[in-house]
Amino acid sequence: LHLLSRRQRQMCIRDSISRMIRDISAPDIKAGNKKVNLRQLVEQQIDSEGLATAEIRHREVSLANVAAEDLSLEVVEYETTATSERFLQWVTSQGKIAGFLRLSLPHANAIAQLSEEYEAATSKTAEQRHTLPFPLQAGEAMIREVHVYGRVEKLQHAGINNAQHRGLGTQLVNRACELASRAGYQRINVISAVGTRGYYRKLGFYDNGLYQQRMLQPMS
């Protein structure tokens, strides 16, 4: 427990632990660790020591109401070997997170290399004529993930302090499009699920193979 709590405290603001332990009910576990609420125990350990963690799940606003004037949009930049990354987050003055977006700005040389490797691999298949082109092209940015937290209510009953119904997600997407355009990208893709495609269509995205895509307006 102490090891896990120490490791979680070392995580940065863009990190999220999706699962700390597998979702198996305690009666079904015949041997070994039976603490199925391990995340809760780790977070209680951190709180009991008067410490904090920047990990996303620990900072969620959850069911709390959030005042609009208490939110600010932050952009964190970092680099990988193949992309320039932008982590956008809506945060309160206490550091709680109401929503975030992960934006990737792929390097042109990385896209070229991956495209060549993809073509080389698919050229060896018997069904080459049915192979789709590499799904990401030069000049295309990628929204990898969007999440907005807060109490979920029916739209007609949405409270003014409800994070999920104040357009925070839309503002994140539009800000990501602005950042991508300023960085010189002409198009932006988004990884979407079946249930969210309608939402992205309303934001100007259209279906385009594996992803949905939106043309970007040049920024002066």
Feature map (PLM): residue ranges:
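Single conserved hydrophobic/aromatic residue that forms the stacking wall/gate
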Residues: H2-R9, I13
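Conserved GNAT acetyl-CoA-binding A-motif
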Residues: E178-S192
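A conserved beta-strand-loop-helix scaffold within acyl/acetyltransferase catalytic domains
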Residues: E79-E119, E127-R151
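Active-site loops and adjacent core secondary-structure elements that bind or stabilize anionic groups
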Residues: M11-C12, V76-Y78
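Conserved active-site alpha-helix within GNAT-family acetyltransferase domains
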Residues: S192-Y211
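Flexible glycine/acidic-rich beta-alpha junction loops that bind and position SAM and/or redox cofactors
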Residues: L1, S16-Q40, V148-G159
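Conserved acetyl-CoA-binding loop-helix of GNAT-fold acetyltransferases
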Residues: G159-A180
